Each structure stands twice: as C-alpha cells, then as structure tokens.
C-alpha cells in the first residue's frame, strides 16, 4: 500500500481525501468477501478524477503477474496530466519504467505513454494537446 500511495500521491500529485479501515458488514456485503477488513485510501486528481487504493488486510494475496493491455477485462487506468514530458522525466528519475517516451497519438490530439504502478497496474498518462 505504501508504495502505491507514494506513486499516486507523491509522484503523480494526487491528493488523499480519505484514509480508513473498514470491516463492517456493509463492506463485506458490497464486495462479496465474507470477513473482509479493507484498508482504503481514496485519492483525487486536480481534474476531480478519483481512485481508491484497497488492501484486504483480512485476505492477504501476492501481487499477481502484470496484465497486458490486450488481456480481456479491466487492464489499465488512464489519467490526464498537464505536462507529460516533465512528469515522464520525474518518474524516470524515480525508477519508473515506460514502454515508450511521451508519444503523440495517431489522432494528433494528445501525448500518451504507459507505465506500471508498484503493483503492476498499467497506468496510461495522457496530456491533451491544445
């Protein structure tokens, strides 16, 4: 959890707006995980996009093998950023690996690149070109 928090908060600049643990019947019913005790950290970006980091304290699991962009199911998240080139350089300096440097999309309206968060989630970073 700490590595993911550092990635999203410290490196991508998202703001923590909630940090709590929940083992109530509500969370167990909603998630469908009996006995769930979940540590949740909710973050938001400047544009209002919100993500939740979840760690099931009651059901520890190893980090799965990284999914590929072409695998079926939810495989990546996309976050809009203001200065992709600068962010790319900062993340490289922190040891984050990318598939390619920021690249203009085929439609020409955005620069994009992919990296992985500390748990292997594909993160697409997008800068809209004005």
Regions found by a protein language model. Name each.
Residues 24, 58, 106, 129-130:
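A short acidic/small-residue loop/turn micro-motif
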Residues 54, 126-129:
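Anionic group-transfer/hydrolysis microenvironments
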Residues 21, 81, 127:
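Residues that line or immediately flank small-molecule/substrate-binding pockets and catalytic motifs
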Residues 19, 53-54:
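Short, conserved beta-strand edge motifs with alternating hydrophobic and charged residues
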Residues 1-48, 86, 93:
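Core segments of cupin and vicinal oxygen chelate
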Residues 1-2, 45-49, 55-122:
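Vicinal oxygen chelate
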């Amino acid at each position: 959890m700490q590595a993911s928090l550092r990635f999203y908060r410290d490196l991508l600049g998202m703001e923590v707006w909630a940090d709590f643990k929940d083992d109530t019947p509500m969370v167990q019913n909603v998630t469908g995980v009996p006995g769930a005790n979940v540590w949740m950290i909710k973050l938001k970006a400047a544009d209002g996009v919100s993500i939740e980091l979840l760690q099931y304290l009651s059901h520890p699991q190893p980090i799965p093998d990284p999914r590929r962009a072409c695998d079926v199911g939810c495989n990546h998240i996309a976050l809009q950023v203001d200065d992709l080139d600068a962010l790319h350089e900062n993340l490289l300096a922190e040891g984050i690996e990318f598939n390619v440097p920021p690249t203009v999309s085929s439609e020409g309206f955005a620069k994009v690149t992919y990296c992985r968060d500390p748990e292997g989630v594909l993160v697409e970073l997008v800068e809209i070109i004005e």
